[in-house]
């Protein structure tokens, strides 16, 4: 498994193309699907308002391994993307990169608006750009005046049905509170972990191979 390979310290780069659902089989709900999104297995209707759970924070799950380089990237920030790929290539250990990108068909976004949607994800704090290197956090793009997360939601048809529901404002407010609190937490972690990498047996001689684990 991915977690096992990271825990053993193998040097590799794992890139997640995060389009927030099982899109190649027809837009089913996944752990990565955001709150309020309309999918075939968590639809918006009389009794449901789409997916009710928060999007799984796979980036923090991977960062918890502590011996890893973890980063988020977006289509709209290509230089940030390239720098993180270069850093992952040079990192002596496992690297995990989460790339947020629209599925234009099932997000119901026009082909020429995918990059703009990515930009809004970053500007609304829905998809913060940051990296974690062995426990040291760094927010690579700070947003001084974030836009409301509603702007990001309105840019995609997958939220349209939910936004018409009587409980829409409650869902919007909950998501806004979540993304704001998460961003503030990242800034706090950046300050708290500055120049304080997690210490451990990260040298190559301590990497346990599958053969040794048998």
Q: Whereabouts are the PLM-identified features?
A:
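Thiamine diphosphate
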Residues: 1-27, 76-83, 88
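Short, conserved beta-strand edge motifs with alternating hydrophobic and charged residues
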Residues: 16, 70-73, 96-100
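Glycine/aspartate-rich loop-and-adjacent alpha/beta segment that forms the canonical ThDP
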Residues: 81-214
């Amino acid at each position: 498994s991915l977690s096992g390979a990271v825990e053993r310290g193998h040097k590799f780069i794992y890139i997640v193309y995060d389009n927030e659902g099982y899109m190649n089989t027809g837009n089913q709900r996944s752990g990565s699907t955001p709150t309020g999104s309309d999918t075939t297995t968590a639809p918006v209707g009389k009794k449901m308002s789409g997916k009710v759970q928060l999007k799984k924070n796979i980036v923090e799950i991977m960062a918890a391994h502590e011996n890893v380089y973890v980063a988020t990237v977006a289509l709209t920030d290509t230089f940030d993307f390239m720098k993180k790929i270069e850093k992952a290539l040079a990192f002596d250990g496992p690297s995990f990169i989460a790339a947020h990108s629209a599925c234009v068909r099932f997000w119901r976004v026009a082909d020429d608006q995918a990059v703009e949607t990515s930009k809004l994800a970053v500007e609304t704090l829905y998809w913060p750009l940051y990296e974690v290197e062995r426990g040291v956090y760094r927010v690579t793009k700070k947003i001084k005046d974030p836009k409301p997360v509603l702007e990001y939601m309105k840019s995609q048809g997958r939220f349209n049905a939910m936004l018409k529901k009587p409980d829409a404002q409650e869902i919007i407010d909950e998501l806004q509170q979540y993304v704001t609190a998460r961003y503030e937490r990242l800034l706090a972690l950046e300050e708290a972990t500055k120049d304080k990498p997690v210490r451990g047996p990260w040298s190559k001689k301590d990497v346990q191979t599958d053969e040794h684990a048998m």
